[in-house]
Amino acid sequence: MIERLRGALASASFPVMALLLLSAIVVYPLWTMLFLGAVFAYIVRPVALRINRRIPYLSVSIILAMIVVIMPLVGILVFTVDSIINSAPSLLSLAGSIHVPGAGNLQPSAENTLANLRTVLRDILSGSLNYVVAILQSVPMISLQLFVFLSSTFYFARDGKRLVGYIRTLIPEETRPFMERMASETERVLLSIFYGHFLTALAIGLMAAVGFHLLGYPYAILLGIMTGLFQLIPVIGPWAAYTPLSIYDFVTGNILRGVLVLIFGLFLSTIDIYLRPKLSGKYADIHPMIFLVGFLGGPVVWGVAGFIVGPLVLGLAYAALEAYRMESGGEEVQ
């Protein structure tokens, strides 16, 4: 037993495994940003290669592609935080001053219900504002994570092909077919998640912002962003944004706008029902429950980044299982 232990310690694999373990400990606090960097590099690289046809410097092309792809997302995030901070006092005041025509004639139970609704709305707005303030208080850590994210996106986009080639040389010959199949399935799953969920949410959010503005709602862009976020959650969808607006209009006596926003919301939901499965199923038919669990469980483990990391991790696990099923000759599930 002791001789076998000595042999294991003296073998070449022991220092390699020990160093890999130490490296994992070093990388662990930042692995979320590294993971996101690898995912965004997958999106940035094709754009950079197109730019590289006109600009002969790949590094410059990647930086320009990152500006094209990532900066709009950063702008939306900054605008959302700024809108919540600036509009929260007005919304809190509005929530406390909601007046229902004929409220004096309502039964006490109905009056209590309205009072409870005001309280819940104020609590939600206050909680959202406190959450944003808490995030802003951790600006140094966020800045570090953002730096790691941008740096990893750049280097993965520039040297990712070499990294994949290096990893391929480490894979034993007998397992390469499985790994190739897994890489193919992973690509299909990533495209399905990106086009079927994130791109659909972006389209729904943009249409919602325009529609809410035309209907005369204040903070239409913020409402559009919220609609896009709700769209990411399969079970919820855009109705979670337009239904409260419709109820508010009905309660405050603006019946016409309440009906119009309800019709507009049904239009958004119809687009969601049609567009999401059409785009997602074009690449990989992922069950909505996988995305839902990842979307809700991810933030619990990884914070705000978990909204993206959670679905991707479960999607990659699904891709690995699908590759294993196909490699072992499993039948197609109907």
Swiss-Prot record:
Family annotation (InterPro entries): AI-2E-like
Q: What is this protein called?
A: Putative transport protein MTH_1211
Q: Spell out the coiled coil positions from the record.
A: none
Q: Report TM segments.
A: 24-44, 60-80, 84-104, 131-151, 189-209, 220-240, 255-275, 289-309
Per the record, the similarity remark reads: Belongs to the autoinducer-2 exporter (AI-2E) (TC 2.A.86) family.
Q: How does it sit in the membrane?
A: Multi-pass membrane protein
Keywords from the UniProt entry = Cell membrane, Membrane, Transmembrane, Transmembrane helix, Transport
- Superkingdom of this entry's organism? Archaea
Places the protein is found? Cell membrane
Q: Name one GO cellular component term.
A: plasma membrane
List the Pfam families hit by this protein, alphabetically: AI-2E_transport
Q: Whose protein is this, by species? A: Methanothermobacter thermautotrophicus (strain ATCC 29096 / DSM 1053 / JCM 10044 / NBRC 100330 / Delta H)
